[in-house]
């Protein structure tokens, strides 16, 4: 069987892997699934570039789900591309497993497309997800720990996330903290920072 779904959302602040991206962001996406195969794209507003133009993040991803020793797993590739020189492009190979009581997502190989004569930089990422409860004030509560390593950037992030159905969609709250090596949209900003976001998303 196959399916095609679309999604739209808004968040009061856009943080990804413990790094600040934008004060607020509107996003749209589409996902196609057929058996164990998946393919999707996601587009988000990431604010102004160095040339003061509206900039977009455009993600494209594909992969396969499978069982590894009886554990649901996936292997995929993903690219992050930006308009108006907001950032250089990222391309990565990802692998993850879901054990029920915990799951993990990892970037087993990442390539940052540096420009202007600079060498490209390899990077890695690991995220551990632990569901805490699915009955917290009508929603689900979870914890995650993640780390990112690439070039001169090395940092870890802790996050608590809550989600619940509301207003015809899903409301999400994230409270996180990154360590001293955290990086933001501006060099050396948003390090050792506690942050919170409120989001709403719809799937149709």
Roles of regions detected by a PLM:
Residues 1-204:
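Outer-membrane beta-barrel proteins
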């Amino acid at each position: 069987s196959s399916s095609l779904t679309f999604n739209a959302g808004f968040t009061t602040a856009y943080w990804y892997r413990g790094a600040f991206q934008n004060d607020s962001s509107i996003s749209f996406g589409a996902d196609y699934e057929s058996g164990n195969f998946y393919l999707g794209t996601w587009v988000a507003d990431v604010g102004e570039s160095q040339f003061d133009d509206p900039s977009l993040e455009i993600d494209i991803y594909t992969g396969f789900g499978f069982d590894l020793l009886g554990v649901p797993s996936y292997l995929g590739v993903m690219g992050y591309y930006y308009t108006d020189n907001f950032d250089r492009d990222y391309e990565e190979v990802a692998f993850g497993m879901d054990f029920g009581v915990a799951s993990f997502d990892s970037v087993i190989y990442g390539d940052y497309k540096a420009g202007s004569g600079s060498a490209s930089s390899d990077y890695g990422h690991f995220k551990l997800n632990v569901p805490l409860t699915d009955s917290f004030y009508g929603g689900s509560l979870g914890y995650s720990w993640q780390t990112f390593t690439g070039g001169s950037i090395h940092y870890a992030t802790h996050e608590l996330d809550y989600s619940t159905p509301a207003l015809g969609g899903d409301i999400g709250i994230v409270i996180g903290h990154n360590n001293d090596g955290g990086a933001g949209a501006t060099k050396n900003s948003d390090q050792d920072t506690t942050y919170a976001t409120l989001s709403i998303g719809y799937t149709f």
